[in-house]
């Protein structure tokens, strides 16, 4: 079974970018509440 490196990178970015974005918003919200 051949693994497509570009596909793995695309999936990793597609998952990690929105997740990091949500984490940043979450941290900013906590900081503002304090």
Swiss-Prot record:
SUPFAM superfamilies in the cross-refs: Photosystem II reaction center protein M, PsbM
Query: Chloroplast among the record's keywords?
Result: yes
**Among the record's GO biological process terms, what is one?**
photosynthesis, light reaction
Q: What are the alphabetically sorted keywords of the record?
A: Chloroplast, Membrane, Photosynthesis, Photosystem II, Plastid, Reaction center, Thylakoid, Transmembrane, Transmembrane helix
What does the protein in this record do?
A: One of the components of the core complex of photosystem II (PSII). PSII is a light-driven water:plastoquinone oxidoreductase that uses light energy to abstract electrons from H(2)O, generating O(2) and a proton gradient subsequently used for ATP formation. It consists of a core antenna complex that captures photons, and an electron transfer chain that converts photonic excitation into a charge separation. This subunit is found at the monomer-monomer interface.
Checking InterPro entries in the record gives: PSII_PsbM (IPR007826), PSII_PsbM_sf (IPR037269)
- Which topology term describes how it sits in the membrane? Single-pass membrane protein
Main location per the UniProt record: plastid
Q: Superkingdom of this entry's organism?
A: Eukaryota
Q: What is the name of this protein?
A: Photosystem II reaction center protein M
Q: Where are the transmembrane segments?
A: 5-25
Q: Where is the signal peptide?
A: none
Tell me if Chloroplast is a UniProt keyword of this record.
Answer: yes
Kindly list the places in or outside the cell where this protein is found, as annotated in its UniProt entry.
Plastid, Chloroplast thylakoid membrane
Family, as annotated: Belongs to the PsbM family.
The record, for NCBIfam families, names: PS_II_psbM (TIGR03038)
Disulfide connectivity for this sequence is none
Cellular compartments per GO CC: chloroplast thylakoid membrane; photosystem II
On subunit structure and binding partners, the annotation says: PSII is composed of 1 copy each of membrane proteins PsbA, PsbB, PsbC, PsbD, PsbE, PsbF, PsbH, PsbI, PsbJ, PsbK, PsbL, PsbM, PsbT, PsbX, PsbY, PsbZ, Psb30/Ycf12, at least 3 peripheral proteins of the oxygen-evolving complex and a large number of cofactors. It forms dimeric complexes.
């Amino acid at each position: 079974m051949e693994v497509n490196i570009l596909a793995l990178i695309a999936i990793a970015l597609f998952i990690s970018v929105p997740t990091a974005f949500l984490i940043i918003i979450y941290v900013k919200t906590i900081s503002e509440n304090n």
